[in-house]
Amino acid sequence: MKQPSALSALVEALRALPGVGPKSAQRMAYHLMQHDREGAERLGRSLLFATEHLRHCDKCNTFTEAQICEVCSDEERDPTLLCVVETPADQIMLEQTMTYRGLYFVLMGRLSPLDGIGPKEIHFDRLVRRASDGIVKEVVLATNFTNEGEATAHYLGQTLKARGLAVTRLARGVPVGGELEYVDAGTIARAMLDRRTM
């Protein structure tokens, strides 16, 4: 038996989400149509609203409904510090720590040559313009500690240092509350190398 075309289209749309395979997409589609049509309609309206109203901040590239986002508009922020993150979700996580009071630049990705993602796709030129505005003194590279994140940090670091900017990288180490017994050897090794004087 062939699926109705409307259901097939819904399954395909759900498959576009990261981490959602064909079976998961099909389960979600059936659930929404069978048990939660109101939720499906709400989801549809929310997606439409988001696509119509969200844009990229002219300064930091994060999602916003205004031309300039709330963080970039905040005059209490330290404009000499610029933290580079991969995604708006990473920016939110850093904000939740309440330890950083500078500004941001959101790459909306990371370098991944095998996937066709180069400097242009991560808005490298915009980052360089922003970091070279004469106000920024230090760029904090807060890309993830994956192979691609490390490669991105290395590439950005080399290029920004060549422009005379101070470039720092988030430290790596044992998570707060983490017991050494349960932490992987690479993390422990990095924590040992990045140890600080007390």
UniProtKB/Swiss-Prot annotation:
GO molecular function: DNA binding; zinc ion binding
Domain Toprim: 80-175
SMART domains: TOPRIM
Keywords in alphabetical order: DNA damage, DNA recombination, DNA repair, Metal-binding, Zinc, Zinc-finger
GO process annotations (BP): DNA recombination; DNA repair
Record bears the keyword Cytoplasm: no
Record Pfam families: RecR_C, RecR_HhH, RecR_ZnF, Toprim_4
Domain of life where this protein originates: Bacteria
UniProt keyword annotation of Disulfide bond present: no
Membrane-spanning segments: none
Zinc fingers, C4-type class: 57-72
Alphabetized InterPro entries for the sequence: DNA_Rcmb_RecR (IPR000093), Rcmb_RecR (IPR023627), Rcmb_RecR_Znf (IPR015967), TOPRIM_dom (IPR006171), TOPRIM_RecR (IPR034137)
Role played: May play a role in DNA repair. It seems to be involved in an RecBC-independent recombinational process of DNA repair. It may act with RecF and RecO.
Family the entry assigns: Belongs to the RecR family.
Protein name (record): Recombination protein RecR
Organism: Burkholderia multivorans (strain ATCC 17616 / 249)
High-level lineage: Bacteria, Pseudomonadati, Pseudomonadota, Betaproteobacteria, Burkholderiales
Encoding gene (name): recR
